[in-house]
């Protein structure tokens, strides 16, 4: 009974961490939308990741001391973050540039399927009809909350690249937890954020060398500084930390269910700034919530059931 209560408490805490993570993450969308009016996409992502990394390193130094930073597995964390979060985020951007926002959003909405497939293949997770029904509701709810018009969907190489992006992000989240079991969530987040920052810096300098668009850096205004801190510290640093904590508690499959609810969170944030309420997104969020609960619920066992083993 005690173990059951501990499991339920861990699941509740994990789901709460995922919700907080997605809430913080969603603040990045309106901030980025405003910054991209003057900033180049490559320069903005590179600076955002650098500021987020410095924030996490500072937080680590404050919590455990500067000396402990030398003991972290920086090289291993770099490569997990480089491939999982760095390449994954860039591939999603490439997918949108090759198709449209609808197709990229559909590819991102498949992340729960990719995440569950990883758990089945690598962790031996057993699927039940109840869990699969929950996954179906989560995907349906996310598509509804996103307001996607399927008539705009384009199947092709761009969509397949988007699927790869979702798979890499799911793999990176799982690898951050499973590959660094000896570390606390904050340390896991910090070492892998280094890899994500390194990849985006590599892309930025490559774009500079080849004189590609998206590298312009304007003279920052006071408003830019505020938005950059929101985008880097809140939508990346705190969000990624809470996200890794949640993944460690409920697994990447269930955690990914929360991530695709971001459009609903963004709507709530924009509502504060005077934008309208969308019942379609609200209904989608409700469907998604039912799916999350269903996927984690366990059927009641018959307490009077007897063992089938021979005496």
Question: Can you name each region flagged by the protein language model?
Answer:
Residues 26, 30, 81-86, 90, ...:
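Hydrophobic/small/kink-forming positions within alpha-helical transmembrane segments
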Residues 1-45, 151-178, 202, 268, ...:
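Glycine-/small-residue-enriched transmembrane alpha-helix faces in small-molecule transporters
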Residues 12-17, 43-58, 79, 131-140, ...:
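Hydrophobic alpha-helical transmembrane segments of multi-pass integral membrane proteins
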Residues 35, 44, 48, 95, ...:
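Hydrophobic/aromatic residues within transmembrane alpha-helices
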Residues 55-63, 111-136, 264-283:
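C-terminal transmembrane-helix exit sites in multi-pass transporters
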Residues 31-41, 97, 145-155, 207-223, ...:
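Membrane-interface helix termini and inter-helical loops of multi-pass transporters
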Residues 56, 127-147, 260, 280-299:
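Hydrophobic transmembrane alpha-helices of multi-pass small-molecule transport proteins
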Residues 24, 28-29, 57-108, 144, ...:
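Specific transmembrane alpha-helical segments of multi-pass solute transporters/efflux pumps
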């Amino acid at each position: 009974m005690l173990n059951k209560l501990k499991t339920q408490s861990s699941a509740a805490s994990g789901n709460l961490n995922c919700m907080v993570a997605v809430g913080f993450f969603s603040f990045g969308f309106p901030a980025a939308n405003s910054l991209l009016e003057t900033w180049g996409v490559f320069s903005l992502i590179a600076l955002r990741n650098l500021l987020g990394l410095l924030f996490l390193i500072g937080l680590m130094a404050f919590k455990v001391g500067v000396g402990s930073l030398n003991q972290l597995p920086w090289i291993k964390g770099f490569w997990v973050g480089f491939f999982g979060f760095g390449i994954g985020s860039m591939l999603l951007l490439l997918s949108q540039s090759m198709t449209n926002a609808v197709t990229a959003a559909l590819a991102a909405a498949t992340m729960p399927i990719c995440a569950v497939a990883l758990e089945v293949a690598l962790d031996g997770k057993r699927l039940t009809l109840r869990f699969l029904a929950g996954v179906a509701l989560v995907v349906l709810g996310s598509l509804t909350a996103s307001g996607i018009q399927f008539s705009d969907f384009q199947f092709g190489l761009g969509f397949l690249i988007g699927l790869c992006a979702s798979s890499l992000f799911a793999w990176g989240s799982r690898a951050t937890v499973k590959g660094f079991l000896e570390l606390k969530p904050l340390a896991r987040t910090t070492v892998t954020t280094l890899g994500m920052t390194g990849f985006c810096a590599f892309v930025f300098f490559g774009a500079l060398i080849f004189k590609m668009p998206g590298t312009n850096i304007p003279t920052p205004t006071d408003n830019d500084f505020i938005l950059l801190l929101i985008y880097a510290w809140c939508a990346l640093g705190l969000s990624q930390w809470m996200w890794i904590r949640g993944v460690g508690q409920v697994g990447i499959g269930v955690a990914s269910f929360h991530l695709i609810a971001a459009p609903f969170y963004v709507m709530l944030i924009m509502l504060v700034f005077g934008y309208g309420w969308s019942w379609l997104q609200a209904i989608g969020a409700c469907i998604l919530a039912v799916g999350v609960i269903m996927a984690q619920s366990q059927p009641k066992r018959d307490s009077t059931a007897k063992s089938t083993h021979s005496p």
